[in-house]
């Protein structure tokens, strides 16, 4: 008969520390991508490595509620809460897109207590590039 294989320890008990290495980040960049359907907030360090991110969809908003200013405010608050715990004090904000959540996300970032060095609008604007799609007929 085959001998039973003894397991030493369980998978649950092996991981004691968190997988993410907690590092002090004094300065960062907050990217806000506000479309009409969703708002995505990404916090990176100055080199561009992602530290934290959140979107209206991950905060539990579904359908048309994802594009609302309140959803953007909630997403920005969730993304920033994690980096404030890691010691971020200063940040620059880059806002992209035409969505309703632009101002609400910026308001939530200001309320978080992080000092903002500047706020920049990086929405891509064509210099009369591609031809737009034909006009919708409803």
UniProtKB/Swiss-Prot annotation:
One term under GO cellular component: ribonucleoprotein complex
Any Pfam family: Ribosomal_S11
Any GO BP: translation
UniProt keyword annotation of Iron-sulfur present: no
Main location: plastid
Keyword tags: Chloroplast, Plastid, Ribonucleoprotein, Ribosomal protein, RNA-binding, rRNA-binding
Compartmental location: Plastid, Chloroplast
PROSITE patterns recorded: RIBOSOMAL_S11 (PS00054)
GO molecular function, one term: rRNA binding
Disulfide bonds, paired cysteine numbers: none
Gene3D superfamilies for this protein: Ribosomal protein S11
Disordered as annotated region, ranges: 1-22
Amino acid composition bias (Basic residues), ranges on this chain: 9-22
Subunit composition and interactions: Part of the 30S ribosomal subunit.
Family, per entry: Belongs to the universal ribosomal protein uS11 family.
Name of the protein in its database record: Small ribosomal subunit protein uS11c
Native organism: Draba nemorosa
């Amino acid at each position: 008969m085959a001998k039973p294989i003894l397991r030493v320890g369980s998978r649950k008990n092996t991981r004691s520390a968190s997988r993410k290495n907690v590092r002090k980040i004094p300065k960062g960049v907050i990217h806000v991508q506000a479309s009409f359907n969703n708002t995505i907030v990404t916090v990176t360090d100055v080199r561009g490595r992602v530290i934290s991110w959140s979107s209206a969809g991950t905060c539990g908003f579904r359908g048309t509620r994802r594009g609302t200013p309140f959803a953007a405010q909630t997403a920005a608050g969730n993304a920033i809460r994690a980096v404030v715990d890691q010691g971020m004090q200063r940040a620059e904000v880059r806002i992209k897109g035409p969505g309703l959540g632009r101002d609400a996300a910026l308001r939530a970032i200001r309320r978080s207590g992080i000092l903002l060095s500047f706020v920049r609008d990086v929405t891509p604007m064509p210099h009369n590039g591609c031809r737009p799609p034909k006009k919708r007929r409803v």
